[in-house]
């Protein structure tokens, strides 16, 4: 299944706020949960909804998300928590959380077009897994810096998660540590996502 490129407002009306996909927010009363019926179908739809929220927020294909679930399942810690950490430490998401891009698709474009450096080296893979002490910067040219300048200047430092640090003068971000669960940028029940996939096998 390919990455979603359709109307974004349609998705947030069904699934709720997806800050990684769009800055728009759904109107109250538009959530899919109100359409549910009782029984097993309701439980399946709830699990499906949480899975879809995760997929669309982080801009993943079904195959990509399934691969992350498999990797998380091999860890000795909570599968759901490891899954969220894997997704949050992707380079495209780190750029989004740092305020260097307004959405994750926007961050992915920056990476694909070779505007972003990690520890001084160009990285053009959006799924690149960042780690503690990684330094994220733009290329040292006017065009690359211009793409993030306005966004970084208008970003709210108070909303920056504690595992990240930003230097708006140097157009530079620092990964301090692996994030804690409470700093995940999406309202999600990751256990339902894990349960969804466990019932597919």
Curated annotation (Swiss-Prot):
Q: Does the keyword Ribonucleoprotein apply?
A: yes
Q: Which GO terms describe its biological process?
A: ribosomal small subunit biogenesis; translation
The UniProt record lists the S4 RNA-binding domain at: 89-157
Tell where it localizes: Plastid, Chloroplast
**Which domain of life does the protein's organism represent?**
Eukaryota
* Assembly and interaction partners: Part of the 30S ribosomal subunit. Contacts protein S5. The interaction surface between S4 and S5 is involved in control of translational fidelity.
In which family does this protein belong, per the annotation?
Belongs to the universal ribosomal protein uS4 family.
Name of the protein this chain belongs to: Small ribosomal subunit protein uS4c
The record lists the organism as Lolium perenne
């Amino acid at each position: 299944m390919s990455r979603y490129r359709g109307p974004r407002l349609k998705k947030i009306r069904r699934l709720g706020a997806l800050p990684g996909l769009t800055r728009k927010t759904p109107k109250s009363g538009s959530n899919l949960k109100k359409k549910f019926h009782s029984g097993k179908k309701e439980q399946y739809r709830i699990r499906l909804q949480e899975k879809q929220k995760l997929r669309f927020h982080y801009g993943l294909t079904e195959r990509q998300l399934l691969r992350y679930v498999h990797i998380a399942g091999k860890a000795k810690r909570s599968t759901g928590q490891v899954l969220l950490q894997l997704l949050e430490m992707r380079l495209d998401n780190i750029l989004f959380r740092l305020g260097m891009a307004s959405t994750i698709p926007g961050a992915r474009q920056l990476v694909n077009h070779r505007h972003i450096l990690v520890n001084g080296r160009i990285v053009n893979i959006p799924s690149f897994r960042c780690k503690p002490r990684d330094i994220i910067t733009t290329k040292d040219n006017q065009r690359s810096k211009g793409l993030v300048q306005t966004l970084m200047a208008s970003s709210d430092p108070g909303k920056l998660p504690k595992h990240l640090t930003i230097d708006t003068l140097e157009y530079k971000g620092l990964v301090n540590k692996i994030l804690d669960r409470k700093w995940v940028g999406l309202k999600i029940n990751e256990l339902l996502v894990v349960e969804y996939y466990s019932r597919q096998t």
